[in-house]
């Protein structure tokens, strides 16, 4: 039975990062299915990723989009860039990102670029080390963004004011 859902009006940007054909070997031969990796974001500090698998590509993409919408996290940005250099990792993938001046653009590869675009980052320098598997790169990028702290958050944690933190 097919599910019917009204189109969502949440103004999220959606990006398809990767589609992959996978197979399961059974006694009668191979059963093919498709996986899809997607990222969604509002372009203003909210970003999520999802991974879907189905027998047909559109169904896999739809599942991935639904999972991405349920998996949204908030990231605090400043003037379209990061607060400070950050590192993230997931399994064999490591990412490094640092803030960049206005006009630099998003200097990032494939999967990392998609995450940064939908998150609302406009100027950043980044590099991926180790495995460049798109799933791991997306997870490492989101990990790095989540662990980034603003000066106000650090000051509150230390019980100081922002001016004392900045020195």
Swiss-Prot record:
GO terms for biological process: translation. It comes from the Bacteria. GO terms for cellular component: small ribosomal subunit. Residues 12-75 form the S5 DRBM domain. Signal peptide: none annotated. Keywords: Ribonucleoprotein, Ribosomal protein, RNA-binding, rRNA-binding. The N-terminal domain interacts with the head of the 30S subunit; the C-terminal domain interacts with the body and contacts protein S4. The interaction surface between S4 and S5 is involved in control of translational fidelity. With S4 and S12 plays an important role in translational accuracy. Located at the back of the 30S subunit body where it stabilizes the conformation of the head with respect to the body. Belongs to the universal ribosomal protein uS5 family. Part of the 30S ribosomal subunit. Contacts proteins S4 and S8. This is Small ribosomal subunit protein uS5. The lineage of its organism: Bacteria, Pseudomonadati, Pseudomonadota, Gammaproteobacteria, Alteromonadales.
